[in-house]
Amino acid sequence: MPSAKQEEDLLVVARPEGLYCPPGDFYIDPWRPVARAVITHAHSDHARPGHAHYLAHVDSAGTLRARLGRDIPLQTLPYGEAIEHHGVRVSLHPAGHVLGSAQVRLEHGGRVWVASGDYKTEPDGTCPPFEPVPCDTFITESTFGLPIYRWPAQAVLFAQIDAWWRANAEAGRASVLFCYAFGKAQRILHGVDASIGPIVVHGAVEPLNAVYRAAGVALPPTLRADDADVDAALLKRALVLAPPSAQGSPWMRRFGNYADAFASGWMQLRGTRRRRGVDRGFVMSDHADWPGLQQAIAGTGAERVFVTHGSVQVMVRWLGENGLDAQAFRTEYGDEDDQETSRGSGSGQTACDADAGSPHPDLPPAGEGEAP
């Protein structure tokens, strides 16, 4: 734990409970129960149960209440509106990660810090795009903080998914696409060509679709697999969105001779598709890729950067080589984007974070890889 003098010099410090703002006496995305928590978004590694008070963006209310309970003590803010707590001015700004995701801007004593949470720099239409917020100190993730990670453009990605779905529909087999139920599933729904066929979703996905629709995000009509209208003929033309936990489960038997695929940033790596046991892999992430991380950090104008999780040491070294004061915060954030990095961690940290920011265990030699 930092000394009192160190805490005086920092607006955010790492404590056993989470990232703590000493002058404001509150935490940002704490992983242990605290009195006051500012939540950047509703993924379970950032929004934990048990806090006495939550502050989040208004569009996170639906997902937070769905995941943590209808009666959680939740205060919400729109983007850009500031409140003051113990002399710290706090405001939330778009992070572009999932619905309601926010960067937390802190202003106190002439200093400005921004804690970004998780973010993505390419707009996807399901949430306001990432907004660079000028600051002195920026706290960044680094989930995909290696030069190998470069995402295809949104239009290219969905052309690939549509072509795969269309070919399967013409062959009379369902297209099962495994993806995370919150964020990625809705992004896929928003981006695919719904004229190709019906869209069926797992029961874990549909409640979150309702939250997105209530927030005004345009999603095509969806059916649940157990709806009366869903029969064998319909399924032969359908796109089916399901969480990774459904793979190999009895729930999958209803689809007969189906084609399957997995949507994840980890599909950039050699061997991931094979290990997942699917026919196709689509390189898709709700986190920034390597160029996106560089763009976001540069856009803040910050002279000091703290890196929280992912390829921490690689990012810290690169930032230092480029003239910034770069340090690491050790955290317990996981990776909602995919569970590939959490094998054996056991603490909610990614394997990268648990190993002090070492590259993904499946990273090919010399940083080379291939998209499946």
Residue positions per predicted region:
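Glycine-biased, low-complexity coil/linker segments
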Residues: 367-369
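Short hydrophobic/aromatic-enriched beta-strand-loop microsegments
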Residues: 58, 73-78, 196-203, 323-332
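Active-site metal-binding loops of divalent metal-dependent hydrolases
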Residues: 42, 59, 98, 117-119, ...
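His/Asp/Glu-rich metal-coordinating catalytic cores
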Residues: 4-32, 36, 42-176, 183, ...
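A short, well-structured beta->alpha microelement
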Residues: 9-29, 214-238, 242-251
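C-terminal regulatory/interaction regions
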Residues: 2-5, 194, 225-355, 372
